[in-house]
């Protein structure tokens, strides 16, 4: 799977036009984004029922903790990316997961994800590797620094402050390098850790911000 550790923060660049940003923070070209849409299918079309069940549990868990519902979650040909989120300045325009990856068995998906993301220290540690990508993308759908709604902008002030405090903390544990890329990846990873990993003062604060502003 593709991997990046920083550079341009494409989540901060959404405007009126919809853009597609991958789970590693890369902005897709218009042609690539169109291919994702054109090849999309229902999650229910996946081969293995246990994988479908795990993804649906991930969505349900997110909705329960964060109080946020995302209407469009599908699988598609997303190249070498685990997932893609379509956004504009008004919010999420849909989440698409990698059809090839999630058409494997649960054990295959989890083993691969642990090896490429947890063992390398790239992503935050969680107890639900198969649900990590969908939760990460749901967090992006909930908030990015480019959203222009009043409550999203107000929440952003607190999220950015939390990010700065987190970045200065040399004693924090359970975090990967990806969250340090920018405030948007910090948000997605800290929320994911809070929902599926070991909670701490940063995960608790992030979730409380989402609830406070009803994101």
What label would you give each PLM region?
Residues 16-215:
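Active-site-flanking segments in enzyme catalytic domains
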């Amino acid at each position: 799977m593709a991997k990046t550790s920083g550079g341009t923060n494409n989540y901060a660049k959404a405007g009126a036009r919809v853009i597609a940003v991958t789970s590693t923070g890369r902005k897709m070209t218009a042609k690539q984004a169109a291919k994702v849409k054109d090849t999309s299918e229902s999650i229910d079309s996946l081969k293995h029922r246990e994988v479908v069940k795990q993804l649906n549990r991930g969505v349900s868990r997110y909705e329960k903790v964060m109080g946020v519902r995302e209407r469009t979650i599908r699988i598609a040909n997303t190249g070498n990316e685990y997932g893609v989120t379509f956004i504009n300045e008004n919010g999420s325009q849909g989440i698409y997961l990698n059809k090839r990856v999630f058409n494997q068995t649960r054990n295959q998906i989890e083993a691969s994800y642990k090896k490429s993301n947890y063992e390398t220290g790239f992503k935050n540690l969680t107890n639900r590797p198969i649900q990590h990508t969908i939760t990460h993308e749901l967090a992006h759908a909930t908030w990015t620094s480019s959203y222009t709604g009043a409550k999203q902008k107000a929440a952003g002030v607190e999220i950015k402050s939390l990010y700065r405090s987190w970045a200065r903390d040399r004693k924090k544990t359970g975090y990967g390098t990806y969250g340090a890329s920018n405030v948007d990846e910090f948000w997605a990873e800290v929320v994911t850790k809070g929902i599926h990993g070991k909670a701490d003062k940063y995960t608790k604060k992030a979730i409380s911000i989402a609830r406070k502003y009803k994101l």
